[in-house]
């Protein structure tokens, strides 16, 4: 039987019921709000917060990129700890591996440890007006002078050697000096090249990366190709970089945690034309290297708030090479440096010549001297540029280099035809019966181009290039039809831009503090900031790859090859005989005669000008005995006779070195 209730009790019960429903509804709404609450969102697709990520894998070290820096980092990690768990992700497919390292000129600069300060003087002069922090500068220059034995030991098990890039043994004094007029350019060094000892070649295309790839695989490296690192993963609270997101070949994405650190060895941004537009001001700047180097690492660093540096400089350090871009390749060929026939010229947008096009600018990484400064060759400012030639020049040789540039150095290289006929058939080269017709086909004013060719031919007849001083020996009349044109574009083999790092390889924020967990190596964030000395980028990649791993693992691998290591003495390949050199004493010159037998220095004597020396006979005998006994120029000077000792060792470089510029 129902209980009778009063109106007051009814209202009280109803109110309590409504309150309960309200509380229940609020709970449901709050739960729904929690479900719909936005996840931690970073500012860019290039960085995700770890709070939103479920890890699929975990490794000690994550190496992003498998060029020179990536291979060096893996090798160093293995040599520190054979059980290290290091995973390597690379964006390219295996057939096109190697990054900018395989497309480069394949040179590595080494410095005699006994001449480190002279090398530093030269490096400072190249950097000006930019200043590299002293700690960074001293670290890098010292590495260039001390790590040759480590590199030799790395390559030894896979039968690769470090030789002179021009052929023969690596000897002190055999090198290319790009800026011989700068202070310190007389440093004692050597330009190295890595090559298969049994390959029979003095120069191996891609040899430097080939050697390090083999050395890394020998030590167990298993690079995962077609695995593109698409983002960094960072703790939203602590800001530590904890891992990466990786896009696999099938399109799926995995997240990999790094227990000790993430290494960005992804190269520069040569393959991203828009980044060149924004950072370097060029409307069309092409990539001469790997098509997979598209600035991904730089974009990740920017998304993190890393401190950028060397995005641009007084010059484009590696230089605007003259590229030839064709539809069949994403990156460019490099125009032939040494033309056998002189019936050619380059013209700018208006159909006129704009500089001495035949000079060997590649020896200064496409710089020339103007008003007391080295500046970039002006190809980027004169677009569109075309090379104009006659039939004699066209048939004389390939129009492109066969040893630098991605299309000719990758693992499946293109072989340009000897007479350019195949490329003409492909439509890569423009042909016309007359200069006027050629001008119309390439978008130049016919009358202007005709006048420029006539002017060029008249200067050939006169025996002088009155406009730009081109060596008349490199010029011939452009008169034998048909005529040809090929477009040239500014092309970059490398760039230095990226986030600043310290000598430990740690990427820095704008306060100069390390971003925990993130490291970089190689071209991305390079220390190179203005003029570029041949062999620097590849060597820096090796040094910085090692430094980052040393920091992560808290160790350092010290390796020595079985043969002792180092570079040979300058006289190591000299023929038997006497070599006479006039050297400069404190005030006046004197003659020094060096005797070589069986590739060894066996005698040093003084010829003319003995009276101009300050050292006495006893000091001379002591010093020369040290040189002969040690077969090493690094012996200490005799007290009281420093200037004469330096003159004698300097004479060795004059007598036996092979410096080019």
Please give the residue ranges for each predicted region:
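Beta1/beta-strand and adjacent pyrophosphate-binding region of the FAD-binding site
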Residues: 53-69
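Active-site- and interface-proximal helix/loop "cap" or "latch" segments in soluble metabolic
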Residues: 568-661
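Conserved redox-cofactor binding core of oxidoreductases
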Residues: 142-252, 273-274, 321-322, 460-480
């Amino acid at each position: 039987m129902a209980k009778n209730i009063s109106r007051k009790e009814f209202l009280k019960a109803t109110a309590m019921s409504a309150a309960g429903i309200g509380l229940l509804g609020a709970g449901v709404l709050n739960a729904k709000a929690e479900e719909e609450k936005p996840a931690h969102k970073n500012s860019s697709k290039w960085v995700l917060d770890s709070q939103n990520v479920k890890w699929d894998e975990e490794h000690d070290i994550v190496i992003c990129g498998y060029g020179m820096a990536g291979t060096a980092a893996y090798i160093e990690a293995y040599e520190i700890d054979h059980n290290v768990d290091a995973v390597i992700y690379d964006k390219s497919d295996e057939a096109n591996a190697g990054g900018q390292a395989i497309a480069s000129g394949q040179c590595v600069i080494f410095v005699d440890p006994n001449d480190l300060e002279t090398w530093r003087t030269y490096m400072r002069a190249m950097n000006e007006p930019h200043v590299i922090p002293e700690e960074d500068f001293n670290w890098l220059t010292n590495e260039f002078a001390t790590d040759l034995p480590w590199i030799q030991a790395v390559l030894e098990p896979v039968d690769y050697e470090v030789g002179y890039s021009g052929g023969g043994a690596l000897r002190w004094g055999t090198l290319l000096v790009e800026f011989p007029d700068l202070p310190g350019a007389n440093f004692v060094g050597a330009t190295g090249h890595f090559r298969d000892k049994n390959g029979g070649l003095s120069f191996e295309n891609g040899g430097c990366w080939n050697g390090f790839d083999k050395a890394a695989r020998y030590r167990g490296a298993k690079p995962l190709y077609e695995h593109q690192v698409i983002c960094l993963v960072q703790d939203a609270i602590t800001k530590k970089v904890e891992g990466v997101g990786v896009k696999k070949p099938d399109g799926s994405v995995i997240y990999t945690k790094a227990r000790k650190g993430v290494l960005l060895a992804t190269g520069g941004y040569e393959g991203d034309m828009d980044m060149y537009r924004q950072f370097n001001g060029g409307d069309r700047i092409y990539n001469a290297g790997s098509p997979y180097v598209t600035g991904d690492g730089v974009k990740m660093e920017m998304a993190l708030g890393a401190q950028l540096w060397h995005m641009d400089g007084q010059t484009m350090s590696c230089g605007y090479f003259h590229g030839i871009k064709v539809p069949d390749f994403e990156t460019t060929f490099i125009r032939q440096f040494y033309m056998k026939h002189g019936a050619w010229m380059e013209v700018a947008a208006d159909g006129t010549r704009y500089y001495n096009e035949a000079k060997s600018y590649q020896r200064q990484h496409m710089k020339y001297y103007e008003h007391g400064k080295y500046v970039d060759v002006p190809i980027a400012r004169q677009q569109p540029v075309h090379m104009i030639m006659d039939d004699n020049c066209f048939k004389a040789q390939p129009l492109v280099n066969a040893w630098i540039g991605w299309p000719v150095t990758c693992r499946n290289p293109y072989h340009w035809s000897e007479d350019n006929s195949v490329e003409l058939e492909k439509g890569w080269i423009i042909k016309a019966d007359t200069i006027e017709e050629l001008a119309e086909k390439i978008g130049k004013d016919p009358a202007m181009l005709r006048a420029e060719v006539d002017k060029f031919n008249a200067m050939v007849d006169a025996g002088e290039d009155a406009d730009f001083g081109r060596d008349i020996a490199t010029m011939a009349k452009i008169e034998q039809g048909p005529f040809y044109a090929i477009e040239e574009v500014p092309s970059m083999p490398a760039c230095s831009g990226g986030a600043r790092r310290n000598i430990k390889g740690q990427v820095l924020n704008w306060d100069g503090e390390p971003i925990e967990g993130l490291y970089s190596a190689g071209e991305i964030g390079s220390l190179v900031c203005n003029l570029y000395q041949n062999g620097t980028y590849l060597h820096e990649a090796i040094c910085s790859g090692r430094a980052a791993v040393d920091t992560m693992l808290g160790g350092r691998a010290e390796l020595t090859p079985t043969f002792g290591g180092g570079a040979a003495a300058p006289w190591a390949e000299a023929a038997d005989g006497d070599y006479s050199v006039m050297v400069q004493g404190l005030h006046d010159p004197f003659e020094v005669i060096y005797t070589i037998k069986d590739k060894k220095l066996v005698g040093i004597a003084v010829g003319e000008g003995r009276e101009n020396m300050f050292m006495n006979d006893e000091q001379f005998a002591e010093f020369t005995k040290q040189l002969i006994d040690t077969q090493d120029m690094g012996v200490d000077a005799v007290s009281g006779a420093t200037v004469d000792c330096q003159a004698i060792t300097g004479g060795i470089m004059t007598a036996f070195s092979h410096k080019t510029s």
